[in-house]
Design a protein with these regions (language model features):
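A conserved hydrophobic secondary-structure block that centers on an alpha-helix together
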Residues: 164-175, 265-280, 287, 291-298
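Alpha-helical coiled-coil heptad-repeat register
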Residues: 57, 161, 176-179, 186, ...
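Glycine- and acidic
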Residues: 34-41, 94-98, 161, 263-271, ...
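A short, flexible low-complexity segment enriched in Lys/Arg and Gly/Pro that occurs
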Residues: 73, 143, 224-225, 259-277
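Active-site-adjacent "gating/activation" loops or surface patches in catalytic cores
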Residues: 230-266, 354
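Active-site-proximal, well-structured secondary-structure segments within enzyme catalytic domains
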Residues: 152, 184, 191, 196-236, ...
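Bacterial Sec-dependent N-terminal signal peptides
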Residues: 1-21
Length: 371
């Protein structure tokens, strides 16, 4: 009866919100259910995320309150199917936050991310839920499961373990605190990086500064400057602007200027400095890993990867280094020789020269004609 009541509540809730003017509720009704970004507004995210959290909490409660013995269907499969709305919204929100953010999205992220971290902890640290998952896991050898079901069971159980399900007392609360802190730190790091990237512009006002650049890149730079109500050509640290400039610009000083701006992001004495943030992230990750019984965060992360441990990673890197070094040295020699043909015998190729001269070498070897 109680399980039926919870199900009815879920159905009623979904019926109510489906009628709302929010694209996240219900199907998108687009080809292949592609995300309708043109219909999604900033104000749609928060209510949908909060509703998604509420719905998944109800779904988790239904699993816990199920009077039947825990089995693959009523526990593992039910857990896998939970949180569909939340996953749907968070996937879009996360992508927009990293690819096309704005002040409103960043402000919302500061509010939402701690809630998502808390929600995740509430699930993986739920003792009753983990008890049912563990009950199914302990009888995995006797269950008639397909390979896919076995993998899902293994993944579900290990995910709980990796997210603190076996911790007790103060260790459990410390895990909550550390993961919440880590979510805030990583968000701040990403926001600082994005803000500093967006804030930088190299404005050129002399036509001769554009030597070597394709016309399409010059036009794009002029449009960027125009959008900022500036005269000239504006180049940014975004890939569509940065990469072509480093590849084609004949002006070495400007290449160096843009290169240094790109590679020293968030290290300057301003509000976007990430140096202390990086240290805090590393230390917090270390504490989490050690709390879970690992030597360090690398060991924790690699446990579920193909490499499995740091030793295997370094072994592979050393093998690659040995295999690729002769080729890299030959390529550098060819690029250095080409650069010296143009600039003189004392010229030394620097990092901001690499894309420029490697592109010239490619053109020379392949006899490419740029249209």
């Amino acid at each position: 009866m109680e399980r039926l009541l919870i199900t009815l509540i879920l159905v009623c809730t979904m019926n109510n919100i489906t009628n709302a003017q929010n694209p996240f509720y219900g199907q998108y009704h687009t080809p292949h259910e592609a995300v309708p970004f043109d219909r999604i507004e900033t104000e749609h995210y928060e209510p949908a995320i909060l509703e998604g959290i509420k719905l998944q909490n109800a779904e988790i409660e239904a699993i816990i309150q199920n009077p039947e013995k825990a089995d693959f269907t009523n526990t593992i499969e039910a857990f896998e199917e939970s949180g569909k709305l939340l996953d749907k919204v968070v996937a879009v929100f996360g992508n927009m936050l990293s690819a096309e953010t704005n002040d409103d999205l960043q402000e919302l992220a500061q509010k939402i991310m701690p809630l998502l971290s808390e929600h995740s902890n509430n699930i993986t640290l739920n003792e009753k839920l983990f008890a049912r998952v563990k009950e199914v896991y302990n009888q995995k050898e006797t269950l008639q499961l397909t390979q896919e079901q076995k993998q899902l069971l293994e993944n579900a159980y290990n995910s709980f373990i990796r997210h603190g399900a076996n911790l007790e007392g103060e260790a459990r609360e410390e895990y909550r605190r550390l993961t919440t802190e880590l979510s805030k730190l990583t968000l701040t790091f990403s926001e600082n990086n994005l803000k500093e990237t967006n804030a930088y512009q190299m404005l050129l006002t002399k036509k001769e500064s554009l030597a070597g650049l394709p016309e399409i890149i010059i036009e794009a730079a002029a449009e960027t400057a125009k959008n900022e109500e500036k005269e000239g050509w504006a180049f940014t640290l975004h890939a569509p602007s940065y990469i072509p400039f480093m590849t084609y610009s004949d002006n070495r000083d400007l290449r160096q200027k843009l290169y240094m701006a790109y590679n020293t992001k968030c290290t300057h004495d301003n509000e976007f400095n990430n140096i202390d943030i990086v240290k805090k992230i590393a230390n917090t990750r270390m504490k989490i890993a050690q709390l879970l019984g690992y030597k360090d965060y690398a060991e924790y992360t690699l446990k579920k990867r193909m490499a499995e441990n740091s030793k295997s990673v370094y072994k592979l890197l050393n093998q690659l280094l040995e295999a690729y070094t002769p080729t890299a040295q030959q390529e550098y020699k060819e690029i250095q020789e080409l650069a010296r043909e143009e600039q003189g015998a004392d010229f030394v190729v620097m990092p901001w020269d690499w894309s420029y001269y490697s592109n010239k070498l490619k053109d020379k070897k392949l006899s490419l004609i740029h249209i």
